[in-house]
A protein has these predicted regions:
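C-terminal helical cap/extension that packs against the catalytic core
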Residues: 15-16, 57-115
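Active-site-proximal loop/hinge segments that shape catalytic or ion-binding/gating pockets
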Residues: 121
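Short, active-site-adjacent cap segments at secondary-structure transitions
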Residues: 124-126
């Protein structure tokens, strides 16, 4: 959980959590964590091209308030947010697109009393921590 810094200011009073999970088994662990929260959870997700995007995201269907897709900054091996959106369009999510990490966090900070969970790639989490 990020409790201070630039990104926490953007998140406002909402909790901001990062998790480097990027495979199917980690998605089950994250989904279980989400089930145990007493607040709505908004996901911010970016992944590498070689991952099982649909299976990873399927774990969160029916559990999250929304999913915001972004590109992994400074990483050529990531799937584009638009291609990612196409790959998971058959899943039941309220999908959003953002051009940046801080933009995605800001977009989700408008939902009161929620948790913003950034996940899907260790590269993404590294960029999040660098921003903060």
């Amino acid at each position: 959980e990020i409790k201070s810094g630039k990104l926490k200011k953007i998140a406002g009073n909402n909790r901001l959590v990062v998790d480097g999970g990027h495979n199917i088994s980690s998605s089950y662990v994250i989904a279980n964590w989400i089930k145990n929260q007493n607040q709505k959870v908004n996901l911010v997700v970016a992944m590498m091209k070689d991952k099982e995007h649909q299976k990873f995201m399927k774990s969160f269907e029916g559990l999250v308030n929304s999913v915001t897709l972004i590109d992994i900054p400074n990483q050529d091996g990531g799937i584009s947010k638009n291609e990612f959106k196409e790959k998971i369009s058959n899943l039941n999510f309220k999908l959003k697109i953002s051009d940046s990490i801080d933009g995605a966090i800001h977009l989700n900070s408008k939902d009161i009393n929620t948790i913003t969970l950034v996940t899907g790639s260790l590269y993404l989490i590294g960029e999040v921590l660098n921003l903060n």
